[in-house]
UniProtKB/Swiss-Prot annotation:
Cofactor: Mg(2+)
SUPFAM superfamilies assigned: Ribokinase-like
Any single Gene Ontology cellular-component annotation: cytoplasm
Binding residue positions for (6S)-NADPHX: G125, N178, V179, N180, E181, F182, S183, R184, D260
Transmembrane segments: none
Biological process per Gene Ontology, one example term: metabolite repair
Binding site for ATP: 231-235, 250-259
YjeF C-terminal domain ranges (all copies): 13-357
UniProt cross-references to PANTHER family, sorted A to Z: ATP-DEPENDENT (S)-NAD(P)H-HYDRATE DEHYDRATASE (PTHR12592:SF0), ATP-DEPENDENT (S)-NAD(P)H-HYDRATE DEHYDRATASE FAMILY MEMBER (PTHR12592)
Family listed: Belongs to the NnrD/CARKD family.
Function: Catalyzes the dehydration of the S-form of NAD(P)HX at the expense of ATP, which is converted to ADP. Together with NAD(P)HX epimerase, which catalyzes the epimerization of the S- and R-forms, the enzyme allows the repair of both epimers of NAD(P)HX, a damaged form of NAD(P)H that is a result of enzymatic or heat-dependent hydration.
Entry protein name: ATP-dependent (S)-NAD(P)H-hydrate dehydratase
Predominant place of localization: cytoplasm
């Protein structure tokens, strides 16, 4: 297989990502490395939540849940016995009076699970059923009130388009829009961003990247500093203050479901990030009394060899690593399958991509 090309600056970032990866130690018990739930899965869309959950599992999550509509549960269960599937999402067909529902009451079975979860992925296969979306909105509000980090993709982003206040100012969530979703979000927030045609018209690649970065920064700022991964030929990652460009090469085949590898990977990385900040293991780093606020603060933490990182820095690293792993999965799968590549082929590449880009923390290597 053609070797992966990683720039020196990217290698530095991946080395920092390794700091938030929990080592494999005998003292850890089941679930201590994290529990992630994907909220999505409907009659027409059962593959997306499966691919997202499996990416999370293959990256190393201890426990993976799918919270879906009843019509999707048996199908998703049949895909893999490794996933815990909960048919708790109501839909128009499952309630007696869809026009008059108590969304908070319908959300309560899902809300009761939140105390056992470390991160959520909201949107894969969710669909646009009105009852379902109202219930998921209540779950998002409750997750935010408990500071549970979450990823929003696909129809989960539709909820933000309709009500940006759901995430505005929440620094523990990541949005992963594609080109069209990004444009809809920008329009909903009254932001004028350059069209893809305008960006493509730039003859200098650096000018194209600059315009994409500015657009991503603008959208993040309008949402109060929410982290955004703008998916494209290269991924643009921004929290409105600091922006990173993923320079890893991906595969040339585009197929539905590849973004689910991204969301699942992000779910695992968010759970690991929570464990890092909870000091679930001794990272060997020096305490850092200063919380990173500015771009200079974040860059200083990234350049530091042995200083604990702030949440703002680790959230950017989570987004960076999720993007990088997904692009490497795509590259590997495309090299192996070419035009026949399917979303499931990316799932098979998650572990090797992790080892190639990030690698096991030093404490794990002594036990492997």
């Amino acid at each position: 297989m053609e070797p992966v090309h990683v720039s020196t600056s990217s290698k530095v970032l991946f080395k920092k990502v390794r700091k938030i990866v929990p080592p494999l130690l005998e003292k850890f018990h089941k679930g201590q490395h994290g529990r992630v739930a994907v909220i999505g899965g409907s009659l027409d869309y059962t593959g997306a939540p499966y691919f997202s959950s499996m990416a999370s599992a293959r990256l190393g999550m201890s426990s993976n849940h799918v919270i879906c509509e009843k019509s999707a549960a048996t199908v998703i269960k049949s895909y893999s016995p490794n996933l815990m599937v909960h048919p708790l999402l109501p839909s128009t067909d499952s309630v007696s009076n869809p026009g008059s529902i108590d969304a908070r009451a319908l959300a309560s079975p899902i809300v009761s699970m939140l105390s056992r979860l470390h991160a959520l992925v909201i949107g894969p296969g969710l669909g646009r059923d009105g009852v379902t979306l109202k219930v998921v909105t209540e779950v998002m509000k409750e997750a935010r009130s408990r500071s549970i980090p979450f990823v929003l993709d696909a129809d989960g982003l539709l909820l933000v388009t309709e009500d940006p206040n759901l995430v505005k100012g929440y620094k523990d969530c990541i949005l992963t829009p594609n080109v069209n979703e990004f444009s809809r979000l920008a329009k909903a927030l009254g932001i004028e961003v350059p069209s893809q045609a305008q960006i493509a018209a730039q003859t200098d690649e650096s000018d194209k990247t600059s315009k994409e970065s500015q657009a991503c920064e603008q959208l993040s700022q309008a949402l109060g500093g929410v982290t955004i991964i703008q998916k494209g030929p290269h991924d643009v990652i921004s929290n409105g203050v600091t922006t990173l460009i993923s320079d890893l090469k991906g595969g040339l085949k585009r197929s539905g479901g590849q973004g689910d590898t991204l969301t699942g990977s992000l779910g695992t990385l968010l759970a690991w990030r929570a464990a890092y900040h909870n000091k679930s293991w001794d990272s060997g780093e020096q305490e850092n009394p200063k919380e990173a606020q500015s771009k200079q603060d974040v860059l200083a933490e990234l350049e530091s060899e042995n200083k604990r990182m702030s949440p703002a820095t680790t959230l950017l690293l989570v987004a960076w690593a999720g993007s990088g792993i997904t692009r490497e999965c795509s590259r590997r799968a495309f090299n192996a399958k070419g035009r026949s590549l399917q979303a499931s082929d990316l799932t098979d590449e998650v572990h090797e991509s992790f080892l190639e880009l990030i690698g096991e923390p030093e404490a794990s290597r002594t036990h492997l």
